[in-house]
Amino acid sequence: MALGEEKAEAEASEDTKAQSYGRGSCRERELDIPGPMSGEQPPRLEAEGGLISPVWGAEGIPAPTCWIGTDPGGPSRAHQPQASDANREPVAERSEPALSGLPPATMGSGDLLLSGESQVEKTKLSSSEEFPQTLSLPRTTTICSGHDADTEDDPSLADLPQALDLSQQPHSSGLSCLSQWKSVLSPGSAAQPSSCSISASSTGSSLQGHQERAEPRGGSLAKVSSSLEPVVPQEPSSVVGLGPRPQWSPQPVFSGGDASGLGRRRLSFQAEYWACVLPDSLPPSPDRHSPLWNPNKEYEDLLDYTYPLRPGPQLPKHLDSRVPADPVLQDSGVDLDSFSVSPASTLKSPTNVSPNCPPAEATALPFSGPREPSLKQWPSRVPQKQGGMGLASWSQLASTPRAPGSRDARWERREPALRGAKDRLTIGKHLDMGSPQLRTRDRGWPSPRPEREKRTSQSARRPTCTESRWKSEEEVESDDEYLALPARLTQVSSLVSYLGSISTLVTLPTGDIKGQSPLEVSDSDGPASFPSSSSQSQLPPGAALQGSGDPEGQNPCFLRSFVRAHDSAGEGSLGSSQALGVSSGLLKTRPSLPARLDRWPFSDPDVEGQLPRKGGEQGKESLVQCVKTFCCQLEELICWLYNVADVTDHGTAARSNLTSLKSSLQLYRQFKKDIDEHQSLTESVLQKGEILLQCLLENTPVLEDVLGRIAKQSGELESHADRLYDSILASLDMLAGCTLIPDKKPMAAMEHPCEGV
């Protein structure tokens, strides 16, 4: 007990000495710490043994002339207006007067805490009596032993804002010479084992609010950069630390006149993060009552709005349809790995940049390089993080159409094949329906299969329209999984021709009756002619006169297929006129066979499979013209042969003299030249003769069948005429009331004459 009382008395005496020294020192000199003044960036004071908070010179609160000692390790020095430059010394060098009010060095930390509590009570009383309007800061430090203080968990600091008694009016004491106060670094207690520091993380917000209310002139707040070191809030409470040799080390901080700068500094990373999440515009809201409303388009726009690849302004709707398609830039990010292209290969071309981006900027874009995040200032003035690809207009591209980059190349590769197939179906096989025979532009009579395939492949390679235009939405949306059709479609081309022939088979003349005989009576004395042009279109496309050069022999001959086509329809044989259902009034006259043959197309197919004729075009001739040409050439050849025979018969052998030899040699040269000139004529006659002979041989059964039908038709027509005459006589007998006997004599006339005749 005695020791406790002695300690209390010693503390009281020391407290009075500190108070008296504080009052006296306030009037003598002002402690000026070398360093930055008000308005400069405050440095951070580092000393041996621990970390000391910086001294902030801030304008704002009218400071008291002196501070009463509030803590054993707290500030016990006050400052005065400048008196002389000689008195400006660091606090560390003038430690003798400051240590007069401190407890002895033999005190421990426990005793120091007890003395600190009692000292706090005395400080409250003394400050409330003498300086009612001054700042009292109870227990602002925490003494630690062996490590830095961490006051975040200290419950005493939670009551720090309530313990602060801030006044906005200057004190009424006689110390009017002081208009501002500065937080002063005073030497700490000798018994303090380590430096003291305060972490402002838990009390920063509350102290900041009190500081704003306490500063009517809006002093600048010091903002400490984010680090792992404890920092001191911007309050008039300076923390005192012990350090024999203080060193000033500048600390980069941000200073401003308002508290919003601190919020921006603390929330810079949050701004970078939320800039990618918070959009700058409202979500898409199209008019669902409009006839142009597309739910799929609205869903895609909503996906692009919700999950953007990169933040930024959206592209206007009127530019959406004219932006080149790109699967990487225009997809919403969902299922991005489904594309077969990589972003690196797609973004290496400056053409993928939005039209809003100028060419100079497009050429300067880093399309390749490490994918490190970089900060880029966007039009919204918000720093946003972007990948190393560096497309400034990443989100300004359209987001609806798919497609894209390499897909266009694949489409261009298969486009000629697809359009070539269309040309084969629409252009290469136009049917000339005005002609009497079903024809196509590329073929008359069918040629061997190799030639047909060559012409089909040539039609497939026709140049397509190279007009520069934007692809339609159907072309853009076409899927690459559907491969192009092969170039040679002989089956399809033949099927089109066959379907065209079927369509013409239905369109028969109105005068024709179902079941009419295909062979009708001619108006000439010759044999019956074939059907007219209206029924001639019923011929299958494969029915044609064909030579022996056909390698496969699939196409039947013209006449045979014509007859068999009608045989399959149930009209294989000629019956009676009653069975055919043809009356005498419906019998029509048709052109004769030469006129029909004159309109039949005939080509000169090459027997050996070579290209037909000169120029590669297939000649189109009628059968009659071919026969006429053959006859003319044959007649010419025969005349020439007669002349040659006369020359050879009347020729004489060469004599031994020189003149005879010269004449014989000249005659030989003329004869040889004549033979060479007529060699082509001979070959043509032989070729056409072989073709006609082959046609006759192949059509011999058909001709025999036709001749037999003609013979039967004549007899049937006679029988039909007789039956028609008998029916007429029968009608007359019924009118007269008489019946005719088989020998065409009236039976009633034999018995009694008919009355009324």
UniProtKB/Swiss-Prot annotation:
Region spans: Disordered: 1-47, 67-158, 192-259, 311-480, 509-551, 597-618
Record has Phosphoprotein as a keyword: yes
Positions of post-translational Phosphoserine modification: 332, 472, 478
Cellular component terms (Gene Ontology): cell junction; centriolar satellite; centrosome; ciliary basal body; cytosol; nucleoplasm
Compositional bias segments (type: Low complexity): 192-206, 224-240, 524-543
Result when mutating residue 337 to A: Reduces CEP68 binding to BTRC
Location of the protein in the cell: Cytoplasm, Cytoskeleton, Microtubule organizing center, Centrosome
Protein's job: Involved in maintenance of centrosome cohesion, probably as part of a linker structure which prevents centrosome splitting. Required for localization of CDK5RAP2 to the centrosome during interphase. Contributes to CROCC/rootletin filament formation.
Protein name (database record): Centrosomal protein of 68 kDa
Source organism of this protein record: Homo sapiens
Organism lineage string: Eukaryota, Metazoa, Chordata, Craniata, Vertebrata
Encoding gene, per UniProt annotation: CEP68
